[in-house]
Amino acid sequence: MTYLDIVNGVLRRIREDEVTSVNNSTYSKMIGDFVNDAKTTVENAWDWSALRTTLTLTTEAGIFNYALVGSQNNIKVLDALNDTSNFFLEYKGSSWFNDKYLNSSTAATGTPSNYNFNGVDANGDTLVDVYPKPNDVYELRFNVVQRTPNLSSDSDTLAVPYLPVLHMAVALAARERGETGGTSTAEYFSIADSFLSDAIALDAARHPEELVWYS
């Protein structure tokens, strides 16, 4: 469903005229803002299948800091692996990395087996440190949940289920105007929560192993 479709879906539900573009009026622009607020809330509520992707980086000998190009500092890593040497990378904390690189007279070199996040670059992409310091070219793969940028063009499409986004935007619009002549704001939020929980339940069925907790 497109950005414009969702905005018009919200407008209809609060008894407003549809628009031919999200930027038609100040009010439709505000509804667009509510749609993006709702989108962010829904995307952050669950590790949606539609948001899962793989980011790769290729190492160089002697370099241990790399940008995850395209991450835009808006990812959750599910797992990471050294695809060249065929094993999973293990996350280590900043103190561990500082000890290996700063407290040691000579940092070990070899095939990378550990990673840590270390800021963002000038493009806004997440920076990753790896250890040992690569001694050759290795391909590292990061399986991530990649949250999407705000919708902006009328034709932009939503990746996550649209009903929770639409109904949460309706709730936000109803709260802003104070009344809708029918359903209360609290009821709108309850409806949105119901759509969200149903959508999560359906998507979670694709990843049942992620709902098993071990003590």
State the predicted function of each range:
Residues M1-S215:
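Glycine-enriched, solvent-exposed interface loops adjoining structured elements
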